[in-house]
A protein has these predicted regions:
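Glycine-rich phosphate-binding loop signature in dinucleotide/nucleotide-binding domains
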Residues: 2-4, 100-102, 154-159
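N-terminal helical cap/lid subdomain that shapes the substrate entry/recognition surface
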Residues: 3-93, 100
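Conserved H-loop
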Residues: 68, 125-129
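Substrate-recognition element of Asp-dependent hydrolases with the DxDx(T/V) motif
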Residues: 71-84, 91-122, 132-136
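Glycine/Thr-rich beta-alpha phosphate-binding loop at enzyme active sites
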Residues: 129-144
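Conserved Lys-Pro-Asp/Glu-containing loop-to-beta segment of HAD-superfamily phosphomonoesterases
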Residues: 141-173
């Protein structure tokens, strides 16, 4: 009897990289642009402080500096910027090793453009099969629905499935209901 194929499905944010690094990348890009356009230096540190305090960063900087920008413009920029991100060495080695013997998939909630920019910046296309990457906006289902997991199970039948994520309240519910180790 042949051993079953292993399918390892990862979450993206705060599993393969720290999502705060995406936030810092976006804030850096915005701070640089605002400094160049409006002459306001050192805005990154302020933005990070406001974020850590739980304040609405975009509303705060717009009102504090009288910027002729809208929250919607800054939010769009945040979501669509091309981030500067890097996998840490241990994560890269793990993915390299696993990709030699397992099918690697990804299931992530979020906007397609944002998640795809993150994956490209991290170089994840080298490890993950394109048909095994599921983004909630693209498929119309979140990880709280069993549908994305069932889709991968249909694509890779007769396999053993593992799910790796960071949020037990969100990431593990459906995989556990379907009998996958998490």
């Amino acid at each position: 009897m042949m051993p079953k194929r292993k399918v390892v499905i990862f979450d993206l944010d705060d599993t393969l990289f720290k999502e705060v690094d995406y936030l810092k990348s976006a804030y850096q890009e915005m701070a640089d642009d605002i400094e160049a356009r409006f002459g306001i230096p050192h805005l990154l540190d302020e933005m990070l402080t406001y974020w850590q305090e739980g304040r609405n960063v975009f509303n705060t900087i717009i009102s504090q500096y009288g910027l002729p920008l809208t929250v919607e413009e800054l939010l769009k920029r945040y979501r669509e910027h091309v981030p500067t991100l890097q996998l840490d060495a241990d994560t890269s080695r793990m993915l390299e090793k696993l990709s030699q013997t397992c099918v690697l998939g990804m299931m992530t909630d979020g906007r397609s453009v944002t998640q795809r920019h993150k994956m490209a910046a991290l170089g994840l296309e080298a490890f993950f099969r394109p048909d095994a990457i599921l983004i909630s906006e693209e498929i119309g289902q979140t990880k709280l629905s069993p549908e994305p997991f069932l889709r991968l199970m249909d694509q890779y039948p007769d396999s053993v499935y593992y799910y790796i994520g960071d949020n037990p309240q969100k990431d593990f519910i459906c995989p556990n209901q379907l009998g996958s180790p998490t």
